[in-house]
């Protein structure tokens, strides 16, 4: 079962993608200069921070993208380039990072994302569109669970779009990765 969840093993040249994402994102951030607010803290650890890409004028709303990486890898720096399209269409963009497994479990990461969303919502106005990929897709879907977010934030959620999320975590309990995930 562990081999079935090893995504990278089934993608030709998988190891080439992350350096490309990092380089493209770095160039994007550098091109924005002072417009990008990098490393805005929302919690006590260094990874509990987000990058915020505001609009020069009033934004149509805020797009929040939560990265994937099996809750064990990557951070906001790898995905900055994804903000380009939303910015071009008049949306501010925020991209949080979170502590990774095995230092913390998935339940803790879920709470961290809820805190990040509350912090971002507190500094923005208008609708919020929430999206994430893979593990990030799981995390954004969890934000719709009762009690995860205050009503004032929930009322602003216009769209929640999990992209290729890990939706059923039970099979992960029987993988080698669960030593990191701490699912019971």
What is the role of each PLM region?
Residues 1-184:
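Alpha/beta-hydrolase superfamily serine-hydrolase fold, recognizing
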């Amino acid at each position: 079962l562990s081999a079935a969840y090893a995504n990278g093993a089934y993608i030709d040249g998988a190891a080439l993608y992350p350096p490309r994402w990092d380089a493209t994102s770095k160039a994007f951030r550098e091109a924005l200069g002072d417009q990008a607010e990098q490393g805005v803290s929302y919690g006590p650890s260094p990874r509990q921070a987000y990058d915020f890409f505001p609009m020069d004028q009033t934004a149509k709303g805020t797009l929040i993208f939560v990265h994937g990486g099996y809750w064990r890898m990557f951070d906001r720096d790898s995905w900055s380039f994804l903000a380009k399209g939303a910015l071009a269409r008049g949306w501010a963009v925020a991209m949080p990072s979170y502590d990774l497994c095995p230092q913390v479990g998935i339940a803790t990461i879920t709470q961290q994302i809820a805190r990040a969303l509350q912090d971002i919502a507190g500094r923005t106005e208008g609708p919020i569109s929430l999206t994430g990929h893979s593990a990030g897709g799981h995390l954004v879907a969890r934000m719709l669970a009762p009690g995860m977010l205050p009503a004032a934030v929930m009322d602003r959620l216009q769209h929640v779009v999990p992209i290729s999320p890990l939706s059923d975590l039970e099979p992960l309990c029987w993988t080698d990765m669960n030593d990191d995930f701490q699912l019971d």
